[in-house]
Each structure stands twice: as C-alpha cells, then as structure tokens.
Amino acid sequence: MGLYDRDYAQDSRLPGTFSSRVYGWMTAGLAVTALTSLGLYATGAYRALFPMWWIWCFATLGVSFYIQAQIQKLSVPAVMGLFLAYSILEGMFFGTLVPVYAAQFGGGVVWAAFGSAGIIFGLSAAYGAFTKNDLTQIHRILMLALVGLVVISLAFLIVSLFTPMPLLYLLICYLGLIIFVGLTVVDAQSIRRVARSVGDHGDLSYKLSLIMALQMYCNVIMIFWYLLQIFASSDKRR
C-alpha cells in the first residue's frame, strides 16, 4: 500500500543474485503478513483491533515513505527491519478486515481473491520478465495513472460520506487492478534488466533489492485487495 521510487531502482547496477533476492524477500514478506493475519484470526484479536484498521493503513504508508526518504542513510539491517515491520503492519491491516469480509460474504470470496491474485501476479511477472518489448513509456503512464487513482480515491472517500456510489467504487477498483497488474509487468522487467548488470555486493545493492522487493510485495497485495473488493461487490449484487 506504499509507493516507492521505482525510477531510482531501474538504473542501478546490481549483482546477478539480485533477482532471486528480490523475489525471496517478497515471498518472506508475504509469509510474515499471512502469519500475522492468521494469528489475529486464530486468537480472535481481530475483533478488538478492527476499529483501529485505519491506524495500520497509515502506519504502512509512514514506513514506506520513511524508507524512501532515508534509504541512503539506513543500514542494511535497518532496511530489513523496516521491511519486516511493513509486512507485520500489512498483516495487522488485513488481519482485521479480511475476517469481516469472510463473515459477510463467505470465505469463498476471500479464497477466490487470494487464488486469482496469485495467478494474475505470476502471469504478469512472467510476462514482464521475458518480454523483449521496452516498457519504459508504459511505466511512466502507469505512474501518472497511479497518482490519478489516489486523487480519485480520496475524492470518492469524501463524496461517499454523503452519497453512496457503489458502481463508481467498483470502477475505481477495476482501474486500480489494471494499474497494479501493469506495474507488476514493468517492475518485473526492471528486475530482469538490473539483474543482468554486473556490480559488487555492497550495501546499496542489497538495499535496492529490498526496495524492489517491497515494490513487488505492494503490487501483489494491491491486486489481492482490489480483487477482494470486486468479488465482494459481485456477491453483494446477487
């Protein structure tokens, strides 16, 4: 749910282990998020924490902005710690909201969104990793679209306090899904590009691989989130 400096990572020269490091940390982050969410559900703590879901949301934004602003000054262990903190906070966010969706729409909606997100992310990342087309221009368009999505979402949040507009929200969810699928493709191509470059194993290269792991983590999380909204909306209209 955070935004990262993607252009900063695209032109860096990194060692050959960069790609496996990125996806390894992304997977670790997702595992931490899943375990945190499951822990809240198993203990029933999500009921008490549900009113504070917005705190976890803003906390993830704060961590992501801090990493982006302080990446040059932070040590590798510090970035690792912040990455894990981000993953835990996302687990707190989803751990308080997903059980509510499951109770209202059924667990099948959650599992359908989870499985679909995994398939869509995998196919998108594979295409980005193996396509020979230059996606640089598409990346710039997607970043502008992402800014527009944030503005539209904030405007919708304000207007919806007075007038419910479920169809407009559904359109926003589809737009968000398209944007993050596209970002997955271009980020995967960026990972492949820098992975082919030859560089040392210094701290900067490791920190940059963690940043790109966060980017891919954010992509798959947001794909899941928008799919969950879409599936829940479809179930509600039946």
UniProtKB/Swiss-Prot annotation:
Subcellular location, record wording: Cell membrane
Record has Transmembrane as a keyword: yes
Main localization (coarse): membrane
An example Gene Ontology biological process: regulation of proteolysis
Transmembrane segments: 22-42, 49-69, 78-98, 105-125, 141-161, 166-186, 208-228
Topology of this chain in the membrane: Multi-pass membrane protein
Swiss-Prot/TrEMBL keywords: Cell membrane, Membrane, Transmembrane, Transmembrane helix
A cellular-component GO term for this protein: plasma membrane
Pfam hit, one: Bax1-I
Taxonomy, superkingdom: Bacteria
GO molecular function: calcium channel activity
Record carries keyword Transmembrane: yes
Family, as annotated: Belongs to the BI1 family.
Protein name in the entry: Uncharacterized protein CT_819
Source species of the chain: Chlamydia trachomatis serovar D (strain ATCC VR-885 / DSM 19411 / UW-3/Cx)
Lineage: Bacteria, Pseudomonadati, Chlamydiota, Chlamydiia, Chlamydiales
